[in-house]
A protein has these predicted regions:
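Surface-exposed binding patches on compact interaction domains or structured appendages
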Residues: 1-14, 56-59, 63, 76, ...
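Short, surface-exposed loop/turn segments at beta-strand-coil junctions that are enriched for proline
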Residues: 17-23, 122-128, 226-231
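Residues on the solvent-exposed faces and adjacent turns
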Residues: 18, 33, 46, 61, ...
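A short beta-strand micro-motif common to beta-rich folds, especially ectodomain repeats
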Residues: 23-35, 129-141, 232-243
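Extracellular and select intracellular beta-sandwich modules with Ser/Thr-enriched
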Residues: 38-43, 144-149, 244-250
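Interdomain boundary/hinge segments at the C-termini of tandem beta-sandwich modules
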Residues: 44-52, 149-158, 250-258
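Beta-sheet-dominated interaction scaffolds and their linkers
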Residues: 51-80, 158-187, 260
Length: 260
């Protein structure tokens, strides 16, 4: 008798099933002599099982990468505890609650909903340095384990928008010759993460004049037309910025001379 014990009278064998508890089990075996009816009682004992628990924590992502312009990222955590009986799994794993902590400039833990952690990053306006941080998720209770998810955000994206215009786009000269100033606007606008940063700044440019009777003046924004004694004539002034790829063409025309 006794939980977990059984016998085979024919061969005087007593068996014990695995003890599912962490306590010793006891029982008795009674042997009865068929002819005399005499009995003998044997005490039985079974050692307590070794019960342990193994914690496991994993994440569906090891790194969260954010845009420089800010944003949210979600990571899903799997956190379990497995009961082991004498070194073997016993039953199914159970869920273990977790807590999270975020470190790193610009990063914060926005929400935790069950196994899902949402991390936020503010805009990084630093033009030379990216940002890094961590999300450390730790199990609650005994045997707790932790997992670290790396956080990464690049440096700000810096770009320039170039503008080059002339008003008017066609300049006319009298036949007797004259010098005219070109009305040119040459600027660049800095953008950080796609947004304007500061005011536009001037960009140098060069002017190339072509056409009979036309030449560049003493500055990049002046054109000289010589005296024209013949038929009307045309030329052009090609203006190129010293940065970027912008260029414009200004048409030049001069009236015919009186002798034409």
């Amino acid at each position: 008798s006794g939980t977990g014990f059984s016998g085979n009278a024919e061969i005087s064998q007593i068996s014990a099933t695995e003890n599912p508890t962490d306590k010793q089990r006891t029982g008795t075996a009674t042997i009865i002599q068929n002819e005399s009816g005499k009995t003998a009682t044997i005490s039985l004992s079974q050692a307590a099982s070794v019960i342990t628990y193994e914690n496991t924590i994993t994440a569906n992502k090891t790194t969260l990468t954010f845009a420089a312009t800010a944003g949210d990222q979600v990571v899903t955590i799997t956190s379990t505890r497995q009961k082991k009986l004498n070194g073997k799994n016993s039953g199914s794993p159970t869920t273990v609650n977790t807590t999270g902590k975020v470190t790193g400039t610009g990063f914060s833990l926005k929400t935790q909903s069950g196994a899902n952690y949402t991390v936020s990053a503010t805009e990084n306006t630093n033009e030379t340095t990216g940002r890094t941080g961590t999300l450390v998720v730790t199990q609650e209770g005994s045997g707790a384990k932790s997992i670290t998810i790396n956080l990464s955000q690049p440096k700000a994206t810096v770009a320039y928008t170039y503008n080059l215009t002339s008003n008017p786009s066609r300049v006319e000269f009298v036949a007797t010759g004259e010098t005219k100033t070109l009305s040119i606007s040459s600027t660049k606008q800095k953008t950080v993460n796609g947004k304007n940063s500061g005011s536009p700044v001037a960009v140098n440019y060069t002017t190339t004049v072509s056409g009979t009777g036309f030449s560049k003046g003493t500055t990049e924004y002046s054109v000289v037309a010589a005296v024209n004694t013949g038929t009307a004539r045309e030329g052009s002034a090609v203006v190129k910025q010293s940065e970027g790829t912008k260029q414009i063409t200004i048409m030049l025309s001069q009236a015919a001379g009186t002798s034409a």
